[in-house]
Amino acid sequence: MSTREEVVVTGLGVVSPIGIGVDAFQESLHAERSGIRRLTLLDPSLLPVQFGGEVVDFEPKQYVRPRKSLKVMSRDIQIAFSAADQALIQAGVSAGTIDGERFGVVFGSDLIQPDPEETYLAYRACLTDDGFDFSRWGEASQTDIYPLWMLKHLPNMPACHIGIAFDARGPNNTVTLGEVSSHAAMAEAVRLIERGWADIVLTGGTGTRVHPTWIVRNSVTEVSHRNESPEHAARPFEAGRDGEVFGEGAAATVLESRTAAKRRGAKILARAAGFGSAFGRATDGGVTQAAIEQSIVGALRDAGLGADEVGFVAAFGRGTRTADEIEARAIRAVLGDVPVTVPKSFYGNLGSGGGAVDVVATVMMLQTHQIVPTLNYEQSDPACPVNVVARAQKLAKPVALVLSQTPMGQAAAVCLIGEA
């Protein structure tokens, strides 16, 4: 029997294509409302993919403080800060109410894409009739790019800004590992508490893939091109799927020891019970079935649970032909006919923010005892032998697994247990 301290969830925050804040987010999930739409924050007419999961009506001045920090905050940082603020408010944590030296931050982040207009003048100054003259870049970058530009795009900035603003003077770390960043960050946050290095840790992830540079660079990969019907583009495990859908978003989770939560009188939302990770890259790219299986088995072992105790899986569901087949076979091999849903069918692949948003969705399903459906699942694919939830259904067992993976071969799983 394990004697380690249980780690619980006491606060959630989310900025997503289906809502800003947990109430709006949950309402959209239950209303089965897609957040995939034609892009509006940039002119998509010249882009090969003109839609995605975009966060609309986000006003950073409502959340970011001090306001002057906005000058050195990219959109990824802004939405991360907002999600963190929401989570801490829900958990009842504020500066002065806890020991700052026992308060940590571990966040997942992508390599943050710069906006083209930020480097346009410097780039143009280097153009010649023969192409790009690299010898001019040193001078042009010094004169035509904002001096603090780099601070807007370092992946550790979300954790830094959050730590400074909320007086979190304990362990502070950033994980940059593609789509599994949030999972790895959450695992590290739990270990900090279990090792006794912190009482409370804010964890989460942030990312955007509806960025023009990202879209252009990745549009030649297996990406859905349903520009005429974007709300039907995200179709994980479905027979008619034609590629993944990009999105943007951030989420944050407040974790603390059960002892600390009870001492504060905090409401416990769920338990962060186990984590598993593995690596295996297929010869033709993508993660291997064995790696996904290993991550699932590892998370269950860490939680001290058996496969028959899992109530549902929040699958990664990339939406490509091969990736979905591999993930489906792995789930079937370890967990049998367990119900499977894909939250990202609502908002797309959010990069390093996706796992954190999936965790928020999963905690909500555990709280409401209801599994939300996978949108656009109309026709099953025999090559994906999983029990996909196409219509909302009651949750029979209060245990969930949240899966993630990267095209480079990383696989990760988080095990969450609902609170009675």
Where are these regions (language model features)?
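ACP-dependent fatty acid/polyketide chain-elongation machinery
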Residues: M1-S69, A91, T259-A273, V360-T374, ...
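Active-site-proximal alpha-helical scaffold in enzymes
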Residues: A80-V93, P155-A168, N172-G207, V245-A266, ...
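A glycine- and small-aliphatic-rich helix-loop capping segment at beta-alpha/alpha-beta transitions
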Residues: D23-S28, P114-G131, I193-E194, I215-E228, ...
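Acyl-CoA/ACP chain-elongation machinery
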Residues: W197-D242, F275-Q289, A315-E325, V338-V386
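Conserved beta-ketoacyl condensing-enzyme motif
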Residues: V9, A24, H30-F166, G170-N172, ...
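Glycine-/small-residue-rich "gating" segment that lines the acyl/pantetheine channel
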Residues: L127-I145, A187, R191-R195, T206-K262, ...
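Cysteine-centered functional microenvironments
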Residues: V8, L12-G13, Y63-M73, W137-W149, ...
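Condensing-enzyme catalytic core mediating Claisen C-C bond formation in acyl metabolism
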Residues: E6-T10, R33-R38, S229-L305, G311-F312, ...
